Amino acid sequence: MSMVYANIFLAFIMSLMGLLMYRSHLMSSLLCLEGMMLSLFVMMTVTILNNHFTLANMAPIILLVFAACEAALGLSLLVMVSNTYGTDYVQNLNLLQC
């Protein structure tokens, strides 16, 4: 494994550990999810460019579209929870009912 892949994998693991350890606030969880998506995007792009996968050139763009949708939904949920309860604690998400 080259150093580039090792560093990208380390960034993904650090974001995952941040997501698992700092779950109290919704904003920190969203930032850790964005770090994971960014490291996945870079890993996918580097892998496709190094291995010359011509059929998979659109895969990083599709991943970015899903990351943008995830960020938009997460921020809208953050705004809704902070307007309703005044805080962005993840514990408040258990109180939401349809």
From Swiss-Prot:
Annotated InterPro entries: NADH_UbQ_OxRdtase_chain4L/K (IPR001133), NUOK/Mnh_C1-like (IPR039428)
Gene3D superfamilies: 1.10.287.3510
Coiled coil regions in record: none
Entry keywords, A to Z: Electron transport, Membrane, Mitochondrion, Mitochondrion inner membrane, NAD, Respiratory chain, Translocase, Transmembrane, Transmembrane helix, Transport, Ubiquinone
Assembly information from the UniProt record: Core subunit of respiratory chain NADH dehydrogenase (Complex I) which is composed of 45 different subunits.
Mode of membrane association: Multi-pass membrane protein
Reaction(s) the record says it catalyses: a ubiquinone + NADH + 5 H(+)(in) = a ubiquinol + NAD(+) + 4 H(+)(out)
One CC-aspect GO term: respiratory chain complex I
Disulfide bonds: none
Family designation: Belongs to the complex I subunit 4L family.
The gene coding this protein: MT-ND4L
TM ranges: 1-21, 29-49, 61-81
Entry protein name: NADH-ubiquinone oxidoreductase chain 4L
GO biological process, one term: ATP synthesis coupled electron transport
Gene Ontology terms, MF aspect: NADH dehydrogenase (ubiquinone) activity
